[in-house]
């Protein structure tokens, strides 16, 4: 099966807000804790082995990486890989820099259509995950959570993790958050949830495709 995301390539790296590219195409950002499997998920969704660099040193990536999607000369959209968060050994100044960069990007980027938030299915909705959601709340844009590494859980543990995450996300809806909040199980290793994630992401990038698939809950 062919997906738009399979036509992805590196575009640019950004380390300061003023360096964000002056593009008009829609963007989807990918966020998550260090070691939540974010780079691996991006690579499997784009059907490439090393599009997003998976560092063996958690917290090493402290900048924003852009990938163009579609035709190289006239991209349809951009995928935006945000720095992993939550690694204790990152120096305080670097951590403060990228937290400021993340929050400013999430709240001010008009091209942004939604966030794909990666959470380790064994430890969903940590305090830092909640902070990321709360940075995004003012935008009213959708957040879709991928509960990664679900292959490491039993079937019942996976069901429980998904239910607990959905319950936690429902708290934001009850508090008045206007954007869609959805979640699904995901495993790059066992290829669980890949087609489901593809369909949702492409419905954000190409609105007319939205009616062709049901949105995960």
Curated annotation (Swiss-Prot):
InterPro entries: G_ENGB_dom, GTP-bd, GTP-bd_ribosome_bio_YsxC, P-loop_NTPase. GTP binds at residues 32-39, 59-63, 81-84, 148-151, 185-188. Keywords: Cell cycle, Cell division, GTP-binding, Magnesium, Metal-binding, Nucleotide-binding, Septation. Its cofactor is Mg(2+). Coiled coil: none annotated. The keyword Zinc-finger does not apply. GO terms for biological process: division septum assembly. Gene3D superfamilies: P-loop containing nucleotide triphosphate hydrolases (3.40.50.300). Mg(2+) binds at residues 39, 61. GO terms for molecular function: GTP binding; metal ion binding. It holds the Pfam family MMR_HSR1. Transmembrane segments: none annotated. Belongs to the TRAFAC class TrmE-Era-EngA-EngB-Septin-like GTPase superfamily. EngB GTPase family. Necessary for normal cell division and for the maintenance of normal septation. This is Probable GTP-binding protein EngB. It comes from Paraburkholderia xenovorans (strain LB400). The lineage of its organism: Bacteria, Pseudomonadati, Pseudomonadota, Betaproteobacteria, Burkholderiales. The gene is engB.
């Amino acid at each position: 099966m062919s997906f738009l995301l399979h036509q992805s390539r590196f575009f640019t790296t950004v380390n300061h807000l003023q360096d964000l590219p002056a593009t008009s195409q829609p963007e989807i950002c990918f966020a998550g804790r260090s070691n939540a499997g974010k780079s691996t998920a991006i690579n499997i969704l784009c059907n490439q082995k090393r599009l997003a660099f998976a560092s063996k040193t958690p917290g090493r990536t402290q900048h924003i990486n852009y990938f163009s999607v579609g035709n190289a000369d006239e991209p349809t959209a951009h995928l935006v890989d945000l720095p992993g968060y939550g690694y204790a050994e990152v120096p305080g100044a670097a951590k403060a820099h990228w937290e400021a960069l993340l929050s400013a990007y999430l709240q001010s980027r008009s091209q942004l259509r939604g966030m794909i938030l990666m959470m380790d299915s064994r430890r969903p909705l940590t305090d830092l995950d909640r902070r990321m959601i709360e940075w995004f709340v003012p935008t009213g844009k959708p957040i879709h959570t991928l509960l990664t590494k679900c292959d490491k859980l039993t079937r019942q543990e996976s069901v429980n993790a998904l239910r607990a995450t959905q319950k936690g996300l429902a708290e934001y809806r009850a508090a008045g958050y206007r954007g869609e909040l959805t979640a699904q199980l995901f495993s790059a290793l066992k290829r669980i949830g890949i087609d489901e994630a593809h369909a949702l992401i492409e419905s954000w990038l190409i609105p007319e495709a939205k009616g062709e698939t049901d949105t995960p809950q």
